[in-house]
Each structure stands twice: as structure tokens, then as C-alpha cells.
Amino acid sequence: MSELVLVVEDDPANAVLVDAILSSVGGFEVVCSDDGDEILNVIQERPVVAVLMDVSLGSTRLGGEKVDGVALTRRIRDLPEGINLPVILLTAHAMKGDRERLLFESSANDYVAKPIIDQKGLVELVRRHIKAAEAVRAELGARDTP
């Protein structure tokens, strides 16, 4: 079974593009959604290895309220399953200072500017963060063992 990556994107064309890159180039199983409640449920119910999160999310709702990708990422971090889950922001916000501000505000792991041009680079970035998260989990597990 393939590793599961969630794509949180409210623009259908962008969702299809990121899904195609991750599934065909990366070999991942991909679930795309713009429903915040669904995203949190999937993270709690299935072994998700990474989340790619659009920052703007004009139509995304969580508990009936409109949220952006920064707020939804913070909610993911509140879940036990989300503490060490790699979250990579996808955004057209590419002005000087946007990267640092968005990473700080959201507690995401990384940032990719749209449009996505380097497909292999995106897959490599996702894999790098998955590997780092696995190393952290292994280290934490080793500390818990007497």
C-alpha cells in the first residue's frame, strides 16, 4: 500500500495538478479535500505521512467556520497525530518575508511557491520531510524504551 499524503486545496485545477505530481511522480496515495473537518478526521483515522496545504483556502470550513491554511495547520498541530506530521505550505504568496512569516504563523515544516514548476523537486521535498519525521519518531521511541 502506498504512503498517504493529504492535499488541502480549494482550487480544483491546483488539486488535480498536485495529486498528479504526487501520485505519478512520487507514487503516493493522495486524498484531496478542501473540508477542514474531513482533513482532521483522515489524519486521526489513517496513517498520513504528509500534508500539502494551500495557504489561502477561500472556501474551506472547519466546524462551520471559514479557515485559511495557517489556521488549519495550527489545528493539525493540536492533534496527537499532527505534532510530528510534515506540513508543507503551497502558496502564491512569494514576496520577501512571506516564507518566514507563514512558516512561523502556521508551524508548518516548509513552503513551496505556486505555480509548481519543479515536479521532482516537490516530491523530493515531501520525501525529505517524511524521512525527517520518521527519524524523530524513531528517536522519541528509543527514548521511551528502558
Enumerate the language-model features and the residues they cover.
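Conserved acidic carboxylate
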Residues: E9
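The C-terminal output helix
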Residues: V126-P146
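Two-component/phosphorelay signaling modules centered on CheY-like receiver
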Residues: P12-D37
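Acidic, metal-coordinating helix/loop segments flanking the phosphotransfer/catalytic sites
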Residues: C32-T60
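Alpha4 helix (beta4-alpha4-beta5 surface) of REC/receiver domains from two-component response regulators
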Residues: G63-V67, A71, I83, A94-V112, ...
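Short, conserved "switch-loop" micro-motifs in signal-transduction and mechanochemical regulators
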Residues: S56, H93-M95, I117
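Conserved phosphotransfer cores of two-component systems
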Residues: Q44-R46, R75-L85, E105-S106
